[in-house]
A protein has these predicted regions:
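A cross-family phosphate/adenosyl-ligand binding-site feature
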Residues: 1-121, 127-184
Length: 184
């Protein structure tokens, strides 16, 4: 693969599929990409920041108000430095925030500050939530603004049912990202 060493920001949200994002971060780091991770409070309930720090070999960003001795606002710097921003698992809540410009934590402020063409969103939720008209309207709005939507897939869900809404598998997410990460 001919690729430049591009900067990737992975924004991890609070869904059970957060554990799958560990594989995504590990694989991207193994491919020599610079991978930064930002996590919501909910994400930290599923996977600890130390896991992502170990996999990426970089500090994990968890707090909007913890700006490490830098005069640049952290959320602006993260948004500007990233060539690609992956939101995974993208919960219904975060999808709604992105669609409507709501920014009340580190991840949502980063996403609001980022150019839409940088964003790749991997939805993850229960089938009923995925099929909710509000979620579908938000997804349509994101697509109309040029955001890439990866999945979701159909299969076994944490609620012990089979349906559409589960986050795409890590290898599928990486394959969707690679065209944006290769030299043109």
């Amino acid at each position: 693969m001919t690729a430049t060493k591009k900067n990737i920001l992975v924004c991890v949200c609070g869904g059970i599929a957060a554990y799958k994002v560990c594989h995504v971060v590990s694989q991207l780091a193994q491919r020599q990409f610079n991978v930064d991770v930002a996590m919501t409070n909910g994400a930290q309930k599923f996977v600890g920041p130390l896991t992502f720090e170990t996999l990426s070999r970089r500090p994990v960003h968890t707090d909007l108000w913890n700006n490490p001795s830098d005069s640049d606002p952290q959320h602006i710097k993260l948004a500007q430095n990233a060539d690609v921003i992956l939101v995974a698992p993208a919960t219904a809540n975060m999808i709604g925030k992105i669609a409507h410009g709501l920014a009340d934590d580190l991840v949502s402020t980063v996403l609001l500050a980022a150019a839409p063409e940088k964003l790749m969103v991997a939805p993850s939720m229960n089938e009923q939530m995925w099929n909710n008209p509000a979620v579908q309207a938000n997804i349509a709005l994101l697509r109309s603004r040029g955001l890439a939507i990866i999945g979701p897939e159909s299969g076994w869900q944490a609620c012990r049912t089979v349906g559409t809404g589960r986050m795409s598998e890590p290898d599928s997410i990486i394959q969707a990202m690679l065209p944006r990460l290769t030299v043109q």
